[in-house]
Amino acid sequence: AKSYRYNLDNEKYELTLEVDRDDIEDDNIGVYSMVIDDMGQQSRLWPDDLVFAALLAGGTETAYDGTAFFSNSHTLGSETIDNLFASTALTADNFAAARAAMMEYSGEDGESLRVRPDVILVPPALEVKARKIVQASTIVESGAAVDNVLRGLCEVVVAPQLSTSAGGLDTTWYLLDTSRPIRPFIFQQRMAPELVSLTSPNDEHVILRDKYLYGVKARG
C-alpha cells in the first residue's frame, strides 16, 4: 500500500487590547472586564475558524492525489472515489443517496473502508431541513404519515461559518464520519490560548504611556 503525507503548517493567533489606565480605574460597571473575557472566548473559538476555513477551501485546495479535496475524480489504487455531489440540494432522498455512496467507499485493496456517516454539517439556512430529515418521528408519503426511517442516522451540527454571509454557501451541506480514529478534521495545537497583561505600575508600557495592555496569543 502507498503512504501519503500531509503537512500541517502552524499558524499564530494574536489579539491585543490597549486601554487607558484611567478608563480601567473608572470602570465601575465592569465593561472592560467583559471585553477582556470576550477576548478569551474568541481565542477559544479560533480553532473552529481554522477548521471551517479549511473546509470552505476544499473545492480548490488539493488532496493527496493532486486533485481538489472535494472532487469526483479521486484515485485510490484502481478505484475512483467521488466525494463531491455538486448541485445536490438537501432532501431526504439526496441525504440517503450521499450516505449510501459514502458507505460504499473502498480502499486500495478493494476492501470496504466501513465508512458510516454520523454527522450532517449544515449552515443555519439548512438547519430546519436537516432536523426534519434525521429527527422527525414521522413523515408524509402519498398523503399518509409513516415512520421516518432516516431518524437518528446522523447528528445535526450547525455552523454559522458555513453561511453565505461568512464566505460559504447557504445551500451546501456535508456528511462526516466522526466515529473513526482518523477524524475528518485535525487541529494541531502547539500552544494553548494564553492571556497576558501589562498592568503593573512598574511595567514599562504603563509608565511611558499610562495605558494597560491585554493580549491573547496561541499557535496551532
Residue ranges with predicted function:
Residues 2-9, 97-109:
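Structured alpha-helical segments in the cores of large, soluble enzyme domains
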Residues 18, 121-122:
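Conserved beta-strand segments of the P-loop GTPase G domain that flank and frequently precede/overlap
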Residues 1-52, 207-220:
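Flexible, glycine/threonine- and acidic-rich loop/arm segments that mediate assembly and lattice contacts
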Residues 9-10, 46, 53, 64-69, ...:
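Generic ordered-secondary-structure signal
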Residues 72-106, 114-119, 125-220:
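Sequence/fold signature of self-assembling virion shell proteins
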Residues 22, 27-34, 41-104:
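Alpha-helical scaffold segments that mediate packing/assembly in large oligomeric complexes
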Residues 7-9, 14, 59, 110, ...:
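Homeobox/homeodomain signature
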